[in-house]
C-alpha cells in the first residue's frame, strides 16, 4: 500500500477489508491497534466472531455487514477467500452467507475514484471477486504477490545471517 500511494502515511488511507474473519482480518485488526489504521471490516454477522473478540477490549474496530457502507469512498479494498483451507466442508454454507459480499465493479465504483484492489491469492473468481475486478486497472494483486517474494527472501536472509 505504501509503495502504491507513494509512501503516503497509512493512517491517512481508508481501507475496507471485506470477507471472512480469519488470519488476514485478524492481522489487520492488530494493525489498527498498533498503527492506528482506518479500516472498515465487512462480513456477515455470523462470521465476525474473532473480530468482535479482539474489539471487546480494544473498541476501535469498525465492523459492519453492509458492503456499500464499508466501501464508500475507501482508498483500498482488500478481500480473501470465503472458505479457508481446512473449512472445505463449510463451503456451500459460506457461499450462501457471503454471496452479497463479492467485490464487483459496483463495489469498486462505490469507492474512491483511484481505489486499489488487493487479494492475498489464490482468488476464487466468481466468488469473493469478479474476473473484471481481478484483472482491472484497480487491481494490484500481481505487485502484491511479487512483494511477498521479496519479504520472504528478506526474512530467510535475516534468519540465516543471525
Predicted regions and their residues:
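Structural/interface elements that position substrates and couple domains in central-metabolism enzymes
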Residues: 1-162
